[in-house]
Each structure stands twice: as C-alpha cells, then as structure tokens.
Amino acid sequence: NPQGEGIDGEFDQAPLYCFDGFDCVTFVNNVLALALSHNLSEFQKKLLLINYYDGIARFDNRFHFMSADWNVQNQKNKFVTDITADIFDEKNKSIALFAEGEIDKPNWFLKKAESETAERADYLRRIALIVKKEFVSLPYLPLLKLFDENKNPREYLFNQIPNTSIIEIVRPNWNLKDKIGTNLHVSHLGFAIRKSNGELFFRHASSEQKCVVEVLLSDYLKNILKSQTIKGINVQAIYQRIAGSAVAGLFFS
C-alpha cells in the first residue's frame, strides 16, 4: 500500500508517503507536493493538503474520489485549475463534453466494510452514516474529437494542453457499483510533460509495467480509442506559480 495515515492512523497504518512504490494517484500527489515544497516539513504539510480535507490525515478525510474530492478541493486550494472547457476547435468553440452522475460515497464505504474484520467494518459503517452521495459534472475532451477520421491526432488541440498539466482518463459513469459500491468517472491519471522539441508525453505510474513510464500522450490515447468505457480526458492545469518554480523544474523536465 503506497499510502496510508501513518503508524498512528485509526484505520490505515501504511506510511503517509513513500518513494519506492506508487499507484497513479500517489505518484501525482507526491510529485505535486514536492514541486510545492523546499524542505521535508513543507512537503509533508503540502501532501496532507493535497490528499485530505483540512489537511488532517484520517481515512474518512481522504480524497477517495478524483471527480468528487480531489479535483474540487485542490482547485479550492489553488493548486490546480480545470481548463478542460478552454480547449477550442478551429472555430474557437470548446470541444468539452461532461461526465455526469452520482458518486455514492455511503455505499462505497459500506461495500468496503464487507471485506473487513468486525471492528474495521464498524468503523467504515459509521463513516457511511455521515458522508453523502454527490452529483458530479466533470468536463472531458472526447477522444473522437482529439483524433481525425484516420486516427491521426489533431495537433492543434494537443498543443493547447499546458506542460505539467494533470491528465485524468475519463470513463463517464464507469459501472463499478456492484464491485465497489459506486460508479466512477476517472480511472487513471498522470502528467502531461512537454519536451523541448514540443512533443507532449504522458508520464504516469503504470499498473501494467509496474513502474513510472513516459509515452507520447497521443500514442497513449490512440491505443485506447477502441475502449467501450474510456471516452476522453480531463485537464487540470497546475497553477503557474507552482509549475514555473525552480523546484518544480526538477520534477517536470
């Protein structure tokens, strides 16, 4: 487990952070926190703000859902801003569509409780009584708009994606309710990294390759065009004061 609430955590005693193993979310969280910080203490504080309500490390406070928690709170904290709807076609019209639907937080906690010990299950059921379902409207760039009829990338669209942006892979109302208790809208994420030659890469923690990898963003997306559930990408731009800092340059090159 690459992330928990630390040894004093009530539910999850895994480390608050580690650098020898990531999933896609913890990779983004750690890199973003490092880019915001100049020392270990600052990194630890920023990491808590990036991943927990009020920066308090408790399982019930964690941003479990990208669309309902992570995006909303990190926009409020002014770490990122959603620019998906600001990507325009050649007629200067936004190409964004919206993934809309409920995130059933109570049922997610109840479903998770089914596979836990009695004491841990009771903890999760108590949380389920407090949290509420949330309606989410998440903009995304449709894959079918990002490529032409011959599956060639429309470069003028990719060129509008800023360097260091966070790319979220969007599956509108991804049907996981029977498995985890709720549908989801986001299944994966990583960074868009623009090289000096202008090429835009997708840097992400790959569950298939078991490491952090880079691939041309257009190639990555082209390979999933046939997916029945993946429909597009959401773009969260990192605030320029962060992306343009000297510290951030170490991580986004």
Language-model features, listed with the residues they occupy:
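Short, solvent-exposed, low-complexity loop/linker segments
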Residues: 154-156
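Acidic/His-rich structured neighborhood in mature extracellular/periplasmic domains
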Residues: 2-148, 159-162, 171-173, 186, ...
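C-terminal soluble interaction/assembly domains
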Residues: 167-252
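Phosphate/adenylate-binding glycine loop and adjacent helical scaffold
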Residues: 151
